[in-house]
Design a protein with these regions (language model features):
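Short, solvent-exposed loop/turn segments at secondary-structure junctions
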Residues: 29-32, 122-124, 142-143, 192-196, ...
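N-terminal auxiliary "cap/dimerization" subdomain that precedes the catalytic jelly-roll/cupin core
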Residues: 1-73, 80, 185, 222-235
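Short, glycine/charge-rich beta-strand/loop segments that flank catalytic centers
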Residues: 55-62, 89-98
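Short hydrophobic/aromatic beta-strand or adjacent loop that forms the aromatic wall/cage
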Residues: 22, 114, 209-213
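Catalytic core of Fe(II)/2-oxoglutarate
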Residues: 150, 156-235
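Catalytic core of non-heme Fe(II) oxygenases with the double-stranded beta-helix
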Residues: 98-186
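A structural signal for short, well-ordered beta-strand segments
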Residues: 92-93, 117-119, 212-216
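A short coil-to-beta-strand element that immediately follows conserved catalytic motifs
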Residues: 81-93, 131
Length: 235
């Protein structure tokens, strides 16, 4: 896979990100995802989440994320969102959901980071509609938080929608989008203004579901809402 060609039109895609709040990137089907998913799955074992595993970091390095994407996102963060931190403020985590996992579904939330990228690594097949844990997201669901207090209040207020019924209600007044990732195109969106969650990975799925979640630039202080929530969740 030619990584330079992969990022060839990133400037125009990032224009869409700023304009619409989200953008899809080119497919990763040319990458050896089967080998990658096997490596990551072995590293993770029974874990649902694992931060910056060896195979995960190797993938990010192979894709040259910090050469082709991070500097451009950093520029947007500074100029469009008045970000004052540094470009190393990143959080990379693998998420593996086994078929029938009843916990990892409809947990709607905002991220604390400015940008979130969902990278599909292994997407299972399911005979049932929305049965393979696809992403549900609402771009521009809230305004950019101006401080930690507004960030906390916004997160707390939207927790009432963290259920299937709540999401159905929220979608009556907000644009809902869904992404199965069967095309293996990563999705990049504004993390702290996009309410997002996942459908369930049903027991009938052909395999586990594995994605990489890349988070860029948390504008909150070191012990802000996002950091504390990650500490509580132990990840």
């Amino acid at each position: 896979m030619n990584t330079k060609e992969y990022w060839n039109d990133i400037d125009s895609r990032l224009e869409q990100l700023v304009k619409y709040g989200f953008v899809k990137l080119p497919s990763l089907k040319e990458y050896d995802l089967d080998r990658l998913s096997n490596q990551v799955s072995i590293e993770m074992g029974a874990l649902t989440f694992k931060e910056s595993g060896i195979a995960h970091k190797n993938f990010l390095n192979n894709l040259n994320i910090n050469e082709y994407l991070t500097p451009k996102l950093f520029n947007i963060a500074q100029n469009a969102f008045n970000y004052k931190g540094d470009s190393l403020n990143q959080y990379h985590i693998a998420r593996k959901v086994e078929p029938g996992n009843s916990k990892e579904m409809y947990r709607a939330h905002f991220d604390s980071h400015l940008f979130t990228m969902v990278i599909p690594v292994k997407i299972p097949e399911s005979a049932e509609e929305n049965g393979s844990g696809g992403l549900i997201y609402f771009p521009n669901a809230r305004k950019m938080p101006s401080n930690e207090i507004s960030n906390f209040i916004g997160k707390a207020f939207h927790k009432k929608y963290a259920s299937k019924e709540g999401l159905d209600k929220f979608s009556n007044a907000h644009e809902k989008k869904e992404e199965s990732f069967m095309d293996y195109q990563p999705l990049l969106f504004i993390g702290n203004t996009t309410l997002h969650t996942n459908h369930a990975v049903l027991s009938s799925c052909s395999s586990y579901r594995l994605t990489f979640l890349a988070h860029f630039f948390d504008p909150s202080p070191k012990y802000g809402v996002g950091s504390l929530l990650r500490l509580i969740r132990n990840r």
